[in-house]
Amino acid sequence: MPWRVLTFRLPAEPSRHRVAVWRDLRRLGAVPLQQGTWAAPDGDPFDAGFAQVIESITTAGGQPIVLTVADDEANAGQLEALFTEQREAEWTEFLADCGKYETELADEIAKGKLTLAELDEEEQSLDRLRRWYRAIKTRDLYGAPSAATADRRLKDCAAALERFADRVYQARERP
């Protein structure tokens, strides 16, 4: 698979442009190669994000240069390894948040905080986890090692929310 490499320069001030570009590249799933140089696989779902980043750099008065790296086995292997390492770090962070979510539900049960407002809040938290899962899954082209565990943990979180919801509704039925 060919890769796109973006190298750019931005004016030193204001720094918000540099931060915005950095955030956009991270959100896109690009991997940093060195300061001001990032890489991502060529094609969907990365093309639109790269175009947006290039526009942001240009609008901020910067100079973007985009190169397409041929599907060279040695380079591709190194880039795939960096890319998968980045996705693995994202999955690890996601798994930690799944653990926090399950702990939060257990704490609410222990406190007897079984209200509809709390249920709504926990549903929103699960929706956030689902959005995050989809975003990482979309970028994880090479199947990072923790992807399957993340899928299982998200299902566990959904099941934990169902059990919490059952308790909330049972608590509402009590006089």
Where are these predicted regions, by residue range?
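Residues lining hydrophobic/aromatic ligand-binding pockets adjacent to catalytic sites
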Residues: 10, 14, 115, 120, ...
